[in-house]
Structures are given as structure tokens and as C-alpha cells.
Design a protein with these regions (language model features):
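Short, acidic, Ser/Thr-enriched surface-loop or helix-capping motifs
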Residues: 6-7, 36
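A short acidic/small-residue loop/turn micro-motif
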Residues: 20, 48-51
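Short loop/turn motifs at secondary-structure junctions and domain boundaries
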Residues: 23-26
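A short, polar/charged loop-to-alpha-helix boundary motif
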Residues: 51-63
Length: 69
């Protein structure tokens, strides 16, 4: 699993597995899930992250697990 955070877009992406995205399912206004053609979840995208998670907590993600930008 990899996590990336784009400060400019204020978006966090959690990579769960590699593969080609067949569709993106909108769970909420700020939460999207990428799915392959077999129905496997490839990744989760959170939009407007700083509205949901305090910026100091976003920083902890980087210190507690590998994060790739």
C-alpha cells in the first residue's frame, strides 16, 4: 500500500493494488474509489482532505508509514 498527498489539489490517494481503472465510484462528494474490470478496489481518493483531517494529522501519515508523492 502506498499513500500520496497532493498539497496543491488537497487530495490524498491510497494505492491498494496496481491495475487498470475500469471505473471510479463516487461514494461521497469527497470520497472516490477506483475499481478494475473484475471489481477489485485499486485505490481510494479523498478530496478536500484538509477539511476532513487537520493538517497536523496529515503530517503524521507521512511519519507513521511510507508515503509516495
Amino acid at each position: 500500500m502506498k499513500i500520496s498527498y497532493d498539497k496543491i489539489a488537497d487530495a490524498l490517494y491510497i494505492y491498494l493494488r496496481s491495475g487498470k481503472v475500469a471505473k471510479t465510484k463516487k461514494i461521497t462528494k469527497r470520497l472516490l474509489v477506483d475499481i478494475d474490470k473484475k471489481g477489485n478496489v485499486l485505490g481510494i481518493e479523498m478530496l478536500e482532505v484538509s477539511r476532513q483531517i487537520p493538517k497536523k494529522e496529515i503530517g503524521k501519515i507521512y511519519s507513521e508509514m511510507p508515503v509516495y508523492a
